[in-house]
Amino acid sequence: LDLTYWLNEKWQISTALEYGEQRYNTRKHLNGNNYLWSNTLSYFPKSGQFWFIGADYNRENTRDEDNAYQRKNLRLGWGQEWGWGISTRISLAYARRTYKGADLFNIRQKNNEYQSAVTLWHRDLYFWGITPKITWSYQRVSSNHPFYSYDKNRIFLEMGKTF
């Protein structure tokens, strides 16, 4: 369920609620459900520019408690249309993920998750109405569990169409 409401001509608020279920044939310990509640406040100071701040709550329930968790996330970002048809979007996020139970090593996992992303595209470049965008994403997870701390860099091509 997604709801978007314009507070006035410059401010918009969006809320999303999701419910899902996972069922696995072989890894039945991961069977369960998940919930997401997401809120975003966007500010459009002028044409071609926007800022946003958001907060999310995600809960994953599984049969085994060492795979079940709660995740609280804060995000902020900025989008800008530049000259020559270039557009960019920059976002930063911090999340705290806390697992419900201890694993085989008797460690109850607690993660601090950091993420940044930069997206670049040309507004006049599209194919059949689909605009390609290139994104660089960096993620760092700092965990109290030695097996789950990592850094990840990704570059990917995103294809999008606005209706």
Predicted regions and their residues:
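Gram-negative and organellar
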Residues: 1-163
